[in-house]
C-alpha cells in the first residue's frame, strides 16, 4: 500500500467510512454469489434485494411479499434528474466561489464540515474537484438523455430500497466531490482560485479517459436499445437478445465496465492520490461487478448459443 494511503486510512472521516462500508458490503455480496449453489442456505428476500431488471426472478417464483416492494425499472431516470439538478446546484456554488469569491451557504459548508471536508485538504487542487464535478454533472445529463431517447425499458422492476439508494447516491457523490475542494479553516472559501495555473498533465489524461469511457458507454446503450427497435428506430418488442459490437465482444456488461472507467478517470483527474475518491471507485467496482456477474448468469442461462469467450465484467479475467 502506498505510504500516503496507509497514513490516511488511520484517520477515516465520515465520508471515507461510509464509502468503505458500502464497498465492503458489495464485496461480501459478490463473494456470496460466487459460492457454488447449495453450499449456503438460500434467502429469497436477500436475492430479491440485490437483483434488478432482467436478473430478478420472474412470475410466481418470487414471493408475493417481494413483489410488494417493486418499482418500475424505467424510474432509473429519476436518479439522473435528481443528479443533474443537485450536482448542477453544487457546480453553480463552486463556480461562484472559485471565480467570484462568493462563500458557500452556511448550511452547505456546515454539512461539508460534518462530512469531514476540513480534513486532509492540503494537497488538493481546486481545479481537480471542479473538473470532476463537471464530469459528474455531464455524466448525469447524458444518462438522463439515454433514459428518455436511447434505452428501451421493459416491464422489469427494481426494489424500493434500490430505488431510494439510487436517489441518495448521486447526492452523496456530489457532496463527496465538493468535500475535496481545498478550503479555508471555516470551510467557506475555496483556496487557489487561479484555476488555469493549477493545470497538470493528469487533468488532461483524466479528461481524455472520461470522454473515451463515456463514448463507449453511450455506444453500448445504443446497441442495447437497438435490440428492441427496427431499422426505422421504432420499438417493436421488449424481449432480450444477445448484444454484439463494441465492448460486447469481450464482456456481457460493457456499460458497467465503462461506468467503472468513468469513475477511474475522475480518480486520475484528482491526481491519483485522493483516497476518498479511490474508496468511491472501490465501491463502484464491486457494485458494478455484482450486477455484471448476475447479468452474465442470466445471458448464459437464457441463450444456449451465448458466446463462450465473453467474460462478465473484466475482459479475459472475470
Curated annotation (Swiss-Prot):
Record Pfam families: Steroid_dh
InterPro entries reported for this sequence: 3-oxo-5_a-steroid_4-DH_C, Dfg10/SRD5A3
The protein's annotated pathway: Protein modification; protein glycosylation
Residue stretches spanning the membrane: 20-40, 81-101, 120-140, 157-177, 195-215, 266-286
Main location: endoplasmic reticulum
Its EC number(s): 1.3.1.94, 1.3.1.22
UniProt GO BP: dolichol biosynthetic process; dolichol metabolic process; dolichol-linked oligosaccharide biosynthetic process; polyprenol catabolic process
Lumenal side: 41-80, 141-156, 216-265
Compartment(s): Endoplasmic reticulum membrane
Role summary: Plays a key role in early steps of protein N-linked glycosylation by being involved in the conversion of polyprenol into dolichol. Acts as a polyprenal reductase that mediates the reduction of polyprenal into dolichal in a NADP-dependent mechanism. Dolichols are required for the synthesis of dolichol-linked monosaccharides and the oligosaccharide precursor used for N-glycosylation. Also able to convert testosterone (T) into 5-alpha-dihydrotestosterone (DHT).
Name the record gives this protein: Polyprenal reductase
UniProt organism field: Ailuropoda melanoleuca
Amino acid at each position: 500500500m502506498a505510504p500516503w494511503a496507509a497514513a490516511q486510512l488511520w484517520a477515516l472521516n465520515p465520508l471515507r467510512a461510509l464509502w468503505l462500508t458500502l464497498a465492503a458490503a458489495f464485496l461480501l455480496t459478490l463473494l456470496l454469489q460466487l459460492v457454488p449453489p447449495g453450499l449456503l442456505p438460500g434467502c429469497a428476500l436477500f436475492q430479491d434485494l440485490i437483483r434488478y431488471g432482467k436478473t430478478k426472478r420472474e412470475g410466481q417464483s418470487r414471493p408475493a411479499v417481494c413483489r410488494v416492494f417493486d418499482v418500475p425499472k424505467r424510474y432509473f431516470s429519476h436518479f439522473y434528474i435528481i443528479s443533474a439538478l443537485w450536482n448542477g446546484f453544487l457546480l453553480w456554488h463552486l463556480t461562484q466561489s472559485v471565480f467570484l469569491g462568493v462563500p458557500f451557504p452556511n448550511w452547505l459548508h456546515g454539512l461539508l464540515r460534518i462530512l469531514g471536508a476540513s480534513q486532509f485538504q492540503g494537497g488538493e487542487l481546486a481545479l481537480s474537484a471542479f473538473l470532476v464535478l463537471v464530469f459528474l454533472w455531464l455524466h448525469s445529463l447524458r444518462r438522463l438523455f439515454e433514459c428518455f431517447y436511447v434505452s428501451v425499458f421493459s416491464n422489469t422492476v427494481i426494489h424500493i430500497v434500490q430505488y431510494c439508494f439510487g436517489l441518495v447516491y448521486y447526492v452523496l457523490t456530489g457532496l463527496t466531490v465538493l468535500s475535496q475542494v481545498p478550503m479555508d479553516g471555516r470551510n467557506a472559501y475555496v483556496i487557489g482560485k487561479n484555476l488555469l495555473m493549477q493545470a497538470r498533465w493528469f487533468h488532461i489524461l483524466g479528461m481524455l479517459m472520461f470522454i473515451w469511457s463515456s463514448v463507449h458507454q453511450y455506444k453500448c446503450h445504443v446497441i442495447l436499445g437497438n435490440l428492441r427497435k427496427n431499422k426505422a428506430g421504432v420499438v417493436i418488442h421488449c424481449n432480450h437478445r444477445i448484444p454484439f459490437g463494441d465492448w460486447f465482444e469481450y464482456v456481457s456488461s460493457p456499460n458497467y465496465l465503462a461506468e467503472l472507467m468513468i469513475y477511474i478517470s475522475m480518480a486520475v483527474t484528482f491526481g491519483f492520490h485522493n483516497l476518498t475518491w479511490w474508496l468511491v471507485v472501490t465501491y463502484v467496482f464491486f457494485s458494478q461487478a455484482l450486477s455484471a456477474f448476475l447479468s452474465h448468469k442470466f445471458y448464459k442461462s437464457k441463450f444456449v448459443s451465448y458466446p463462450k469467450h465473453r467474460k462478465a465484467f473484466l475482459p479475459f479475467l472475470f
